[in-house]
């Protein structure tokens, strides 16, 4: 893909799979024409580690936030603190935050509380919100619409991306109406992901992003291996040929 420079919009370079490997990962990413990476925070208590990785190379940016799996275990973080941390120039988004009713690792009321805090932080910082949603479409839509409604009243719009998107059409339509982007991972290349491919075809090209969510979800033809940012090329090529 020598004519195109790619961005891996969502990876986790602070995870153990990448310990001591970031320089080599960046080298392989460059060889695949991946020009930039966004490494995503899942615990505010580990934000310093995420930020240090981002500061190690100009090709890496980061986010700040609490994954819904961690909502119950992480110390309470209010909107002011998230906005404060987001002032660092390396921070380009709030999250990943959201709702996960598939694993339910945190109580649902706690997940919604933490998600609402991140939504407000994204509005106040004017940074995009990075949303994780699994088996929680209705509540995710309700929270996002509430945040978007506030933005319509006070001039601080809510922007963001639904990361590692998996169907339904309902969530895609609601997110697009609010003004969000849709980010597709290697899942879209999987044989059993026809429903996702059909939803992807409904998303305007200028609202689509690609990501790895590495070290997870390696795309075909790398499926079964530990994922890494260079593999975003395979997802991008697959989508280009499909769309």
Q: Can you describe what each PLM-predicted range is?
A:
Residues 1-243:
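Mid-domain alpha/beta scaffold segments of enzyme catalytic cores
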